Amino acid sequence: MMKVLIVDDNASTREMVKIILQRTGHEVIGEAGDGDSAIKAFADLRPELVLLDIIMPGKSGIEVLSEIRGLDPAAKVIMLTAVDQDAVNSDLLSNGAAAIIYKPFSFDDFEKAFSKLK
């Protein structure tokens, strides 16, 4: 079981992710709807895993990933995105994302991404 922070500007997406995480035995310790809130929540809560959307108002998920890496280089971050572009994806992975889950997602997508954390 991991303590997880969910970051997505869409409340419905956050709720779906929360349900999947709870069904797989993980604990959602926080949620954020924008980049600045995400960084504050990460600093305050110190989750074991961050599920992070890329396209959000204000700071993008890419910027948030960089700031999280600055706070904790060992932080585990899985990106959530509808963007399936090789250049963006390789940039995310080279900047420390453990995996990428594409929207629309399924339960299996989370299991596959979580297996990359071990």
Segments from the language model and where they lie:
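Conserved sequence signature across two-component system core domains
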Residues: V7-D8, A32, V50
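The feature encodes the CheY-like receiver
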Residues: P57, Q85
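C-terminal output helix
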Residues: F105-F114
